[in-house]
Amino acid sequence: MSFRQAFDAERLKRDADRRVREDAERARQEADEARSIELYEILAADPGFLAERKLVLERSRYTVGLEHPDFRLRAYFEDAQINVTAADKRSATTITAAPTKQQYVDSVEQALDVLAQYLADETV
């Protein structure tokens, strides 16, 4: 094998490895996005409850949020985990309130349970 052939073979190998990594990352991102849509649809299924609790449901890429005048609940989806947070707007010094509670979960059902717990904590 010549030096050129060895170089070309190495470059092809690296390109193939890069494509595998990119495909895996894209698949992870698509799964995270699908799970965020799933949680959003579960929460959106009861608009009466959201209105009763003065919650505004929002979704952006990988994030589902519940906004209330006094607090913010969020679920952020990344690498097959869900970071669920609660933030108190009443004591915030800036527009973006820092999370006061945080829990990592693995499933949409667990995220729903933690959001319900955080909502109960805020409304008791």
Positions of predicted regions on the chain:
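Short intrinsically disordered terminal tails
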Residues: 1, 120-124
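Short linear clamp-binding motif
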Residues: 1-15
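Negatively charged, low-complexity tracts enriched in Asp/Glu with abundant Ser/Thr
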Residues: 11-68, 99-102, 106
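Hydrophobic "lid"/C-terminal helical patch
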Residues: 115, 119
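Intrinsically disordered, low-complexity regulatory segments enriched in Ser/Thr/Pro
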Residues: 70-113, 124
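Short, mixed-charge, low-aromatic patches
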Residues: 1-4, 67-72
